[in-house]
Amino acid sequence: MDKFTKLTGVAAPLPIVNIDTDMIIPKDYLKTIKRTGLSKGLFAEMRFNEDGTENPDFVLNKPGYRNAQILVAGDNFGCGSSREHAPWALLDFGIRCVISTSFADIFYNNCFKNGILPIKVAQEDLDKLMDDASRGANATLTVDLEAKEIHGPDGGSISFDVDDFKRHCLLNGLDDIGLTMEKAGSIDTFEAKRAELRPWA
């Protein structure tokens, strides 16, 4: 998993509340267990028309936002079913950070496990960031996980809270496997000692 320390990138505004995981990636794209190639399904029902052509009005199809790395979204983002494909699709598109006033718990935790930083902010701060994100190609934010701050294009900053353990994992690029490998030495020592004490096992 890639480390997340400081990210400067274009922020796309998505001022829609209750975006569920089926809206993030429809069920038609859940037939794979691969984490790559899912970007084509991200917000598919909003990004594409029925004939498969792009919907020019959807934010991620607009020229200034095609390479967005940050998503500023409405309240209760990621509600609905617990599909882990939702953060996979966001990450495959290039989204490394989602900012909202609240998230569904399972989606929130899945983001951390997949290298995405979900940030909860107050409504007034979200309104400010949504305005900042509406500037098209100039909608650049800097998210500093070490300092726990978001810096806007005008130089202002917003502080945010994040669980210390989850922050540690993102800063060091540790997923569940990485966390286990951190303890590899202790595990090897335990296994060797157990073999001495219980050679028959």
Swiss-Prot record:
GO terms for biological process: L-leucine biosynthetic process. GO terms for cellular component: 3-isopropylmalate dehydratase complex. InterPro entries: 3-IsopropMal_deHydase_ssu, Aconitase/3IPM_dehydase_swvl, AconitaseA/IPMdHydase_ssu_swvl, IPMI_Swivel, LeuD. It holds the Pfam family Aconitase_C. Keywords: Amino-acid biosynthesis, Branched-chain amino acid biosynthesis, Leucine biosynthesis, Lyase. Pathway: Amino-acid biosynthesis; L-leucine biosynthesis; L-leucine from 3-methyl-2-oxobutanoate: step 2/4. It is an enzyme of class 4 (lyase). It catalyses: (2R,3S)-3-isopropylmalate = (2S)-2-isopropylmalate. One of its GO terms (molecular function) is 3-isopropylmalate dehydratase activity. Signal peptide: none annotated. CDD domains: IPMI_Swivel. Its EC number is 4.2.1.33. Belongs to the LeuD family. LeuD type 1 subfamily. PANTHER family: 3-ISOPROPYLMALATE DEHYDRATASE SMALL SUBUNIT (PTHR43345:SF5), 3-ISOPROPYLMALATE DEHYDRATASE SMALL SUBUNIT 2-RELATED-RELATED (PTHR43345). Catalyzes the isomerization between 2-isopropylmalate and 3-isopropylmalate, via the formation of 2-isopropylmaleate. Heterodimer of LeuC and LeuD. This is 3-isopropylmalate dehydratase small subunit. It comes from Brucella anthropi (strain ATCC 49188 / DSM 6882 / CCUG 24695 / JCM 21032 / LMG 3331 / NBRC 15819 / NCTC 12168 / Alc 37). The lineage of its organism: Bacteria, Pseudomonadati, Pseudomonadota, Alphaproteobacteria, Hyphomicrobiales. The gene is leuD.
